[in-house]
């Protein structure tokens, strides 16, 4: 719903993707979702290395760069940004910004890809 999907995006297995942008060849593992409304119903804020960006809207999911791999059962919280060529481990709960060429492990640990 209200999604921009670039070429060859894969959202194949029991996913919910709302109010989000998924880059070229991004892949959502089985059961992974983009949460697009905050639990407190406040406006969504996108966080970046440069600071916070006020969206001014209540519904905003996630932005995934090109060739991002999202593991099974992952929740991408409202306003999450995942840089190109990054991997998200299964069963993660992602908040905020994940740099390009990174691996997001459980509990928010982010390491650079080799």
Regions found by a protein language model. Give the residues of each.
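Glycine-rich hexapeptide-repeat left-handed beta-helix
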Residues: 2-114
């Amino acid at each position: 719903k209200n999604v921009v999907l670039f070429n060859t995006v894969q959202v194949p297995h029991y996913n919910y993707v709302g109010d989000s942008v998924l880059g070229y060849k991004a892949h959502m593992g089985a059961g992974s979702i983009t949460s697009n409304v905050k639990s407190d119903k406040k406006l969504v804020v996108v966080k970046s290395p440069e600071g916070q960006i006020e969206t001014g809207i209540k519904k905003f999911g996630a932005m995934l760069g090109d060739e991002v791999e999202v593991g099974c059962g992952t929740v991408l919280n409202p306003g999450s940004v995942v840089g190109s060529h990054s991997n998200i481990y299964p069963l993660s709960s992602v908040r905020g910004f994940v740099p390009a060429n990174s691996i997001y492990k459980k509990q928010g640990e982010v390491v650079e890809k080799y």
